[in-house]
Swiss-Prot record:
This is Holliday junction branch migration complex subunit RuvB. It comes from Dehalococcoides mccartyi (strain ATCC BAA-2266 / KCTC 15142 / 195). DNA binds at R314, R319. It comes from the Bacteria. InterPro entries: AAA+_ATPase, AAA_lid_4, DNA_helicase_Holl-junc_RuvB, P-loop_NTPase, RuvB-like_N, RuvB_C, WH-like_DNA-bd_sf, WH_DNA-bd_sf. Gene3D superfamilies: 1.10.8.60, P-loop containing nucleotide triphosphate hydrolases, Winged helix-like DNA-binding domain superfamily/Winged helix DNA-binding domain. Residues 1-185 are annotated as: Large ATPase domain (RuvB-L). The keyword NADP does not apply. Has 3 domains, the large (RuvB-L) and small ATPase (RuvB-S) domains and the C-terminal head (RuvB-H) domain. The head domain binds DNA, while the ATPase domains jointly bind ATP, ADP or are empty depending on the state of the subunit in the translocation cycle. During a single DNA translocation step the structure of each domain remains the same, but their relative positions change. Its EC number is 3.6.4.-. It is an enzyme of class 3 (hydrolase). Keywords: ATP-binding, Cytoplasm, DNA damage, DNA recombination, DNA repair, DNA-binding, Hydrolase, Nucleotide-binding. Belongs to the RuvB family. The lineage of its organism: Bacteria, Bacillati, Chloroflexota, Dehalococcoidia, Dehalococcoidales. The gene is ruvB.
Length: 349
């Protein structure tokens, strides 16, 4: 669906985000805002590895897009004082592609694989001995005379990032020494991120203006920085460049981002469930067909925040809009919905 490419409040990396993300990226754990428990545990692991003079144990980062998985990987490399090699699951098509990357790593280097859940099983199998034994097994020859040759690899750290933790195979998950989930940020943390970014970009913003952006950022730093940039442009053209509360609210209203950070596509998902399917429950594939979207995109991009807000429920029968969703959209909640939910509960569904 082409709309997703232009979606302002998507956590996915857009083409014009890369340069901005790099300029705003913190360079050490102490500058990384939010995710306190993750930071504390990761900081201990980094310090311990440095004190022992070892490579950091393999790290898996998972959670919705835009929460800082790539940023954390760069911070880990900087904190460890090592090089980082960046690639992605879809970019590694064959075993030979991964073998070429692994054999070019230097001692203690970091290999960052984004979307690691998209590695094929054949390629994934190359990682098992590489992660566990720092070795690469290659087949020499063909047919009955083929034999396995083991090449030693330098000790390195694999950092995997994924939005689909459940899609990782158990053997791959088990080989990560540290597994961290990144959660949506609370409004105070997003406020601090917007404030920091505004300072770096030289943008003048009042406290209420920062709050207006933060509350619409879906708990996602990438979205917060993107909205800040759009509001900055609006304030420059329509005002004197100062982001006030009214200026931010006016700008975001023009961009069709409501007070909770929902856009027209979020509204479309919820209204489709409510109006076309009686509020649900309805299957994911059915919703996808109704709004001309891929089921995976709905599950990865739209659902996490709607679930976080309590606007959507996943039930054994499918997706269901909650009373909160009706209230937010100013749609009367049907009286018979409570009775239906009671019957489902009695039936154990």
């Amino acid at each position: 669906m082409s709309e997703e490419k232009e979606r302002l409040i998507s956590g996915k990396l857009a083409a014009d985000d890369a340069k901005l993300d790099t300029s705003l990226r913190p360079r050490c754990l102490s500058d990384f805002i939010g995710q306190k428990r993750l930071k504390d545990n990761l900081g201990v692991a980094i310090q311990a590895a440095k004190q022992r003079g070892e490579a950091l144990d393999h790290v898996l980062l998972y959670g919705p897009p835009g929460l800082g998985k790539t940023t954390l990987s760069h911070i880990i490399a900087l904190e460890m004082g090592v090089n980082i090699r960046i690639t992605s699951g879809p970019a590694i098509e064959r075993q030979g592609d991964l073998a070429a990357i692994l054999t070019n790593l230097k001692p203690f280097d970091i290999l960052f694989i984004d979307e690691i859940h998209r590695l094929s099983r054949n390629v994934e199998e190359v990682l098992y001995p590489a992660m566990e034994d720092y070795a690469l097994d290659i087949m020499v020859g063909k047919g009955p005379g083929a034999r396995s040759l083991r090449l030693k690899l330098p000790h390195f750290t694999l950092i995997g990032a994924t939005t689909r933790y459940a899609m990782l195979s158990a053997p791959l998950r088990d080989r990560f020494g540290s597994i961290f989930r990144l959660d949506f940020y609370d409004e105070d943390a997003i406020h601090d991120i917007v404030s920091r970014s505004a300072h770096i970009l030289g943008v003048e913003a009042e406290e209420n203006g920062i709050r207006q952006i933060a509350c619409r950022s879906r708990g996602t730093p990438r979205v917060a920085n993107r909205l800040l940039r759009r509001v900055r442009d609006y304030a420059q053209v329509k005002g004197n460049g100062l982001i006030t509360g009214d200026m931010a609210a006016e700008s975001l209203a023009c961009l069709e981002v409501d007070r909770l950070g929902l856009d027209e596509i979020d509204h479309k998902v919820l209204k489709t469930i409510i109006h076309k399917f009686g509020g649900g429950p309805v299957g994911l594939e059915t919703i996808a067909a109704a709004i001309s979207e891929e089921a995976d995109t709905i599950m990865d991009v739209y659902e996490p925040y709607l679930l976080q807000l309590g606007f959507l429920e996943r039930t054994p029968r499918g997706r269901q809009a909650t009373r909160l969703a009706y209230q937010h959209l100013n749609i009367p909640y049907p009286a018979d919905k409570n009775n239906q939910q009671g019957l489902w509960a009695e039936n154990g569904t």
